A protein has these predicted regions:
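N-terminal leader/targeting pre-sequences
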Residues: 19-197
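Bacterial N-terminal signal peptides that target proteins for export
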Residues: 1-8
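C-terminal motif of bacterial Sec signal peptides marking the signal peptidase cleavage site
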Residues: 14-17
Length: 197
């Protein structure tokens, strides 16, 4: 009977131990942090597809002396462009395009490739089917400067088909927006690579 009493007492003690107020502090693990996605970033978006601003510094060809800055801003499917440039002939008109390759290393800027054209459209003005890189021609004022703003529709700064990482080129002559594939804008007199800001 003594064995039965001892066994009963051991069972009560064991049950009482299980009914304590919780595990000892050494047995508690701290919570493991779980990363959560930022509410404004979709899992399929990249840094570049969310780009809202970009800049290209125009450097001159060996013979032009033209310098400038091109500031791009916007989101969605339109981009605002602000171009400032100096060193041009007063009253001259210049073709202006985004080119396919972000490289202005060659002296004639041919390293920038052809016009940026991810949609494989013909060259043309903004109110007709055109390359994504086709932009309005620019007019230099009487002091040989350009300071102009315009908006491009149907293009983006970032993403696979965005402007960032490509080159912007100012040409010696006006773009006729007719001749294929580039509008006969002449020599490339200034070039800059478009970088996200």
């Amino acid at each position: 009977m003594r064995i039965a009493s001892t066994l009963a007492l051991a069972t009560v003690v064991a049950l009482a131990a299980c009914a304590s107020k919780g595990p000892s502090p050494a047995a508690v693990s701290p919570p493991v942090p779980v990363p959560s996605a930022s509410p404004d970033v979709k899992p399929t978006e990249s840094y570049f597809s969310r780009t809202k601003a970009a800049v290209a510094t125009l450097t001159p060809s060996a013979t032009s002396g033209v310098t400038g800055i091109v500031v791009f801003s916007g989101g969605g499917t339109s981009v605002d462009v602000h171009v400032t440039a100096t060193g041009l002939q007063p009253g001259s008109i210049h073709g202006f395009h985004v080119h396919d390759v972000g490289n202005c290393a060659s002296a004639d800027f041919m390293s920038a490739g052809d016009h940026f054209n991810p949609t494989h459209r013909p060259h043309g003005p903004q109110d007709h089917p055109h390359h994504a890189g086709d932009m309005p021609s620019l007019l230099a004022d009487p002091s040989g400067k350009i300071d102009v703003r315009f908006t491009l529709e149907g293009v983006t700064l970032g993403g696979v088909d965005g402007f960032v990482g490509h080159a912007v080129v100012l040409h010696a002559s006006a773009d006729n927006f007719d001749a294929q594939p580039s509008g006969n804008s002449g020599a490339r007199i200034a070039c800059g690579v478009i970088a996200a800001q």
